[in-house]
């Protein structure tokens, strides 16, 4: 029969007391939020002044999440009319961001994207207020 002299208990308590004084690994979310790396794939930001409404981001998206609406101005150049994303289908893969030739579409640090209603998941990044041409809109 084995003799129990309490060495196992003392080893366990020593480990517990050693870990007790270390910095905790977890954060008290949502009171404290961790700093995210710069290349984090969060939500999206569209710099509408840079966007040329080429539609490359729309074509690059594997789930067809992006809808780019465009109009033609007086010089017959395409201008951005609307930019919408169905976020419920987005994989956050970044192919749309990589495809943008002018870096108009970028990721931001926002990651709290949960919504209560499914209708609120649609992300409208740009909607032109006034349409100056009478030609209407076309998809890029």
Curated annotation (Swiss-Prot):
It catalyses: a quinone + NADH + 5 H(+)(in) = a quinol + NAD(+) + 4 H(+)(out). PROSITE patterns: 4FE4S_FER_1, 4FE4S_FER_2. Keywords: 4Fe-4S, Cell membrane, Iron, Iron-sulfur, Membrane, Metal-binding, NAD, Quinone, Repeat, Translocase, Ubiquinone. GO terms for molecular function: 4 iron, 4 sulfur cluster binding; iron ion binding; NADH:ubiquinone reductase (non-electrogenic) activity; quinone binding. It is a peripheral membrane protein. Its main location: membrane. Its cofactor is [4Fe-4S] cluster. Its EC number is 7.1.1.-. SUPFAM superfamilies: 4Fe-4S ferredoxins. One of its GO terms (cellular component) is plasma membrane. Residues 42-71, 81-110 form the 4Fe-4S ferredoxin-type domain. It is found in: Cell membrane. NDH-1 is composed of 14 different subunits. Subunits NuoA, H, J, K, L, M, N constitute the membrane sector of the complex. NCBIfam families: NuoI (TIGR01971). PANTHER family: NADH DEHYDROGENASE UBIQUINONE IRON-SULFUR PROTEIN 8, MITOCHONDRIAL (PTHR10849), NADH-QUINONE OXIDOREDUCTASE SUBUNIT I 2 (PTHR10849:SF24). This is NADH-quinone oxidoreductase subunit I. The lineage of its organism: Bacteria, Bacillati, Bacillota, Clostridia, Thermoanaerobacterales.
């Amino acid at each position: 029969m084995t003799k129990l002299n309490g060495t196992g208990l003392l080893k366990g308590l020593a480990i517990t007391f050693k870990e007790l004084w270390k910095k905790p690994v977890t954060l008290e979310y949502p009171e404290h939020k961790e700093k995210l790396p710069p290349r984090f794939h969060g939500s999206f930001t569209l710099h509408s002044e840079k966007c040329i409404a080429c539609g490359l981001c729309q074509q690059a998206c594997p789930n067809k999440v992006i809808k780019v609406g465009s109009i033609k101005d007086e010089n017959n150049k395409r201008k951005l009319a609307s930019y919408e994303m169905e976020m419920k289908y987005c994989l956050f893969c970044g192919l749309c961001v990589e495809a943008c030739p002018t870096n108009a579409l970028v990721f931001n640090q926002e990651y709290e994207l949960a919504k209560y209603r499914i209708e609120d998941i649609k992300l409208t990044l740009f909607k032109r207020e006034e349409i100056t041409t009478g030609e209407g809109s076309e998809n890029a």
